[in-house]
């Protein structure tokens, strides 16, 4: 997303962020170029999607999280923040080695309608993380952490932390 990425670069420079590398890439479970449609009107969010049929069509490189970590020679990953409009399960599947090796804390947005566009459910994302040894809690609008009932997952932001050994 060139315009969005340029804005991110400007903000990083404006705030004198020194320990930061920025990459204009999509993260998923394969390595390829993908088309993303960026809405022409500001929706107040990063609503770019592979599934919009209007807006500016741009092509971006996509990589797997595991490949990115290997390519960069990272020896530590503590935290992952993901708000990728339904691509969360693809991100997790493309980062299975990272999750097993580093056990990062994960802040992730999960919204049912976005998951449906990618052919899965919020429960699939939840089950993927629980199956990798994570415990999840919902972050309420007031910022409180609430234990989850996997049969009734709300839309919103979730904090997943690795279970203690």
Language-model features, listed with the residues they occupy:
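Phosphate/nucleotide-binding beta-alpha loop and adjacent structural elements of enzyme active sites
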Residues: 1-165
